Amino acid sequence: MAVVTTKQLLESGVYFGHATRKWNPKMKPYIFTSRNGIHIINLKKTSEEIEKAYQELLNIITSGGKALFLGTKKQIQSSIREEAQRSQQYYVDHRWLGGTLTNFKTILKRIELLHLLHKQEEEGLWKKLPKKEVVKLKRKRDKLEKFLGGIKDMKNLPQAIFIFDPEKESIAVAEARKLGIKVFGIVDTNCDPDLVDYIIPANDDAIRGVKLIIWLMANACVQGNGGVAEKAETFDAKNPLKPQNYNTLNKRPYQDSPRKPSYQNQNQR
């Protein structure tokens, strides 16, 4: 049984690419057609690539590996955090700190400091300090929690990294590739698919579509850990469908309803 249906992809608006003038020629195999100066992504290809990514991530987790979810755009931060927590994986939902992977020993020292600050507060040690000093310590703890909270339990490097926007997170991509960590990523028509090992061609500005893909990758991790993947009904309940509201991240100038009969026949052409 397919992990995602064409109907789900259609309703989530993942098939809208960028303006044709902004396209990356390497994305040609994943483009179905163009309309009104906008590339339309081939949903059959998207479905196939999601299936490949899902199975590979499932295999990695089943083999005892761990994944890191990365997405720092404000609109999807909560989804990255919640789905990573649901699937018991690591995440970064704010700015990527250079060297998080390639200089992991230094990052571990910062993580140790974060744990120490939490421990000191829990044990009541801060109550003995001047108020001004406590304010400084809280500020330091909160900053560390903001950037390292999602990886504070990460004692070793992950075996996979799922990236919402590989072009924006180019430093993380470079670090992962240097270390041989498998890179999974959502790639729009203006992006370079060579940046990732497992490409998911999709509209990276369709909030519901992006959340759908993050949810699917989290399901792969849940299943890899021996759990039961959530059903589509659960995703729909958490992310109610809002027709004609798929492009609110960067507000692309689409003027037609995403669900047109001509696109529903993609798999038949």
Swiss-Prot record:
InterPro entries: Ribosomal_uS2 (IPR001865), Ribosomal_uS2_bac/mit/plastid (IPR005706), Ribosomal_uS2_flav_dom_sf (IPR023591)
A GO cellular component entry from the record: cytosolic small ribosomal subunit
Matches recorded under Gene3D superfamilies: Glucose-6-phosphate isomerase like protein, domain 1, Helix hairpin bin
Entry annotated with the keyword Ribosomal protein: yes
Keywords: Ribonucleoprotein, Ribosomal protein
GO BP field: translation
Region feature (Disordered): 235-269
Keyword flag Ribonucleoprotein: yes
GO molecular function terms listed in the Swiss-Prot or TrEMBL record: structural constituent of ribosome
Pfam families the UniProt entry points to: Ribosomal_S2 (PF00318)
PANTHER family named in the record: 30S RIBOSOMAL PROTEIN S2 PROKARYOTIC AND ORGANELLAR, SMALL RIBOSOMAL SUBUNIT PROTEIN US2M
Protein family per UniProt: Belongs to the universal ribosomal protein uS2 family.
Protein name as it appears in the record: Small ribosomal subunit protein uS2
Gene name per UniProt: rpsB
